[in-house]
């Protein structure tokens, strides 16, 4: 299997046998959302460098072994097998939920610890496992918060266009159930290909006050936004993108002002503390642009795993109590893990969730609209 390997080591240390290795999974090429993967990897690499500058893991340097998953579940599962053969102490990363699910299932089967950085799909594994934990809020929590935001803003009839995917289907179901419980309605619109323009006709016919985009970026998301913005019948219609597409610089570059005022979920606290501010500045320098919440997730993932490896030891099997004992200070707060009722993986239950958008007056600035 092809992939890239990134080694982050302290200056003057080059004894490869002494390294503690973490396998890092990220979408770095298309059809994966490679912009998200680049931010995720930047956060992980920065954290590894800081861990090594502070002495590593019991004096041993930490090293990332990176594999590009390219939004391919089969490729991710193969990467987990390969990384296990290479002797990594744990796995980290992944952005795409369906890909993370494949990686988590394989890690569980192999007994390899995996801390998922960014994927939110609730059912990361089919069975209860001690091996897998997750940093971001589960989809059922985040998307309910998004539905609550829509209801609080006065939206009761909401349209959605969705591409075929377990992730999008799960998200639509969460939204529909939450809205229905509060007298709201979610109406599914067809998504014609290759021209999404007929979405505007269907939206006008449904008399919905909002349209949610459960679709990929750049296309068809960019074309749909442009079509809706230019249709006079739809003036005042809210466009929403709960999966976070407007977070990244490519969204603003493609849509400029048309991409503003589109609420999305963002997994950051309302204000970063001193650690978050310092890491944010370092990430901005590393990325040559504002870091997304995904970059902070990458940093925090390695920070948590480094703490686990220091306290629990390298090469010792995890027990059901290992994740429960974690208490790691990260850029977005202190991470502690527990199991939600019915959950199969360990979860940071208090992970921050916001609904934000880009300010129409200044699209490079984000406005916090709602917190959960």
PLM regions: where:
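Extracytosolic ligand-binding ectodomains
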Residues: 1-372
């Amino acid at each position: 299997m092809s992939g890239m390997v990134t080694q982050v080591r302290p200056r003057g240390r080059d004894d490869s046998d002494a390294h503690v290795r973490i396998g890092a999974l990220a979408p770095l090429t298309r059809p994966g959302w490679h912009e998200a993967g680049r931010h995720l990897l930047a956060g992980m690499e920065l954290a590894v460098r800081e861990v090594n500058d502070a002495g590593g893991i019991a004096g041993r340097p930490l090293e990332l072994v990176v594999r590009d998953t390219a939004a391919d579940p089969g490729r991710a599962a193969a990467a987990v097998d390969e990384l296990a053969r290479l002797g990594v102490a744990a796995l980290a990363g992944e952005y795409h939920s369906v890909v993370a699910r494949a990686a988590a299932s394989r890690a569980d089967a192999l007994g390899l610890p995996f801390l998922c950085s960014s994927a939110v799909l609730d059912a990361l594994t089919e069975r209860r496992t001690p091996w897998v934990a997750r940093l971001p809020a589960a989809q059922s929590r985040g998307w309910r918060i998004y539905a609550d935001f829509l209801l609080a803003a006065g939206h009761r009839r909401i349209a959605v266009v969705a591409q075929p995917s377990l992730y999008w289907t799960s998200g639509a179901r969460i939204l529909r159930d939450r809205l229905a419980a509060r007298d709201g309605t979610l109406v599914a619109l067809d998504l014609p290909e290759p021209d999404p323009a007929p979405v505007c006709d269907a939206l006008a016919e449904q008399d919905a006050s909002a349209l949610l985009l459960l679709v990929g970026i750049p296309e068809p998301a960019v074309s749909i936004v442009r079509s809706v913005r230019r249709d006079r019948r739809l003036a005042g219609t809210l466009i929403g993108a709960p999966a976070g597409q407007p977070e990244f610089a490519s969204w603003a570059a493609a849509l400029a002002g048309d991409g503003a005022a589109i609420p999305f979920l963002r997994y950051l606290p309302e204000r970063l503390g001193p650690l978050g501010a310092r890491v944010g500045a370092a990430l901005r320098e590393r990325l040559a642009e504002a870091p997304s919440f995904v970059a902070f997730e990458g940093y925090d993932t390695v920070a948590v795993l480094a703490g686990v490896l220091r306290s629990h030891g390298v090469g010792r099997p995890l027990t059901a109590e290992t994740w429960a004992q974690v208490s790691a200070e990260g850029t977005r707060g202190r991470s502690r893990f527990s199991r939600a009722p019915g959950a199969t993986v360990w979860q940071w239950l208090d992970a921050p969730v916001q609904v934000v958008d880009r300010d129409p007056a200044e699209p490079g600035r984000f406005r916090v609209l709602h917190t959960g």
